[in-house]
Amino acid sequence: MEISYNRFCDLLHKDSCVYFESKEDNEICAFAIVEDFAIRLICVIPPKQGHGIGTKLISDIEKHAGDRGFDKLITGGVSSRLFIGAISESWRFFEKQGFVSVGKCDEMILKLVDFQLDKLALHGSDIAEYGWFDGNLEDIRSAVSLVDESWTQYFINSENIYVAKVNGEIASFCLVDINCQNYLTDKYRKVGMPGCVGTVPKFRNNGIALEMVARVTEYLKDQGMDVSFIFFTGVAKWYEKIGYRTFLSEYFGVKQLG
């Protein structure tokens, strides 16, 4: 991953984290970064992996969290601006430490130079009309609540809400962000994101949301974004239909303490 030191510190909420490290011959060979009960990051340099160093760090983190009254540890955490879980390649390590998976997600990317909306077989517009939301925010929040109540807090600015409507009724919706500052920015420069993509249950399975995301992806390309980033999804195969590809899979791990 290509990421600058300053961006790393910013994304990590550095000032609210606790840092653990392991040294050999006065050189750091492993470290972990923890915020409250969330292990934001744990790294062991390859030559030192498999020697119990990571296990010792986990033990130190458990004691630290327990001493502060926490009864569990989690990998990543959805509030993390870096990894929100344990990446799949490292999950076996966490299992050995007693972590249990309570879910999994994928993160996806599409290089926009390769994207061509007119080459896709889309059918949502057979029944839906697409455009930027220009109505009452309470109406969009009502539709969002039918999909995921926790998302309503993010729908606060109508200027970045894109919707599909059927006979004037909100059927699908998503948030649209350009020039995002995240862990992909240093590598890809201009990153855009469709987020909180959802379809009201009674309008599902009609291709409405798929065309909506495709249209938003085209918009991001028109705005000069280099890539479109899908953050935290459980429907990777659905996004693959319009060209997105998974580059990272993560497990949400939990370990009870005490």
Task: Name each region found by the language model.
Residues G224-G258:
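Short hairpin/turn module used for nucleic-acid contact or packing/dimerization
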Residues G50-A65, C196-T199, N205-E218, D222, ...:
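Conserved acetyl-CoA-binding loop-helix of GNAT-fold acetyltransferases
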Residues R7-Y19, E24, C29-I42, S145-T199:
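A conserved beta-strand-loop-helix scaffold within acyl/acetyltransferase catalytic domains
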Residues I39-G50, V78-S79, C196-R204, G234:
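A short, internal acetyl-CoA/4′-phosphopantetheine-binding micro-motif in the GNAT/acyltransferase core
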Residues C29-A30, G103-D106, A171-S172, L248:
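A structural microfeature
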Residues M1-K23, E27-I28, C105-E107, D118-W151:
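Short amphipathic alpha-helix that is part of the acyltransferase structural core
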Residues S59-D126, G253-K255:
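Acyl-donor-binding surface of acyltransferase catalytic domains
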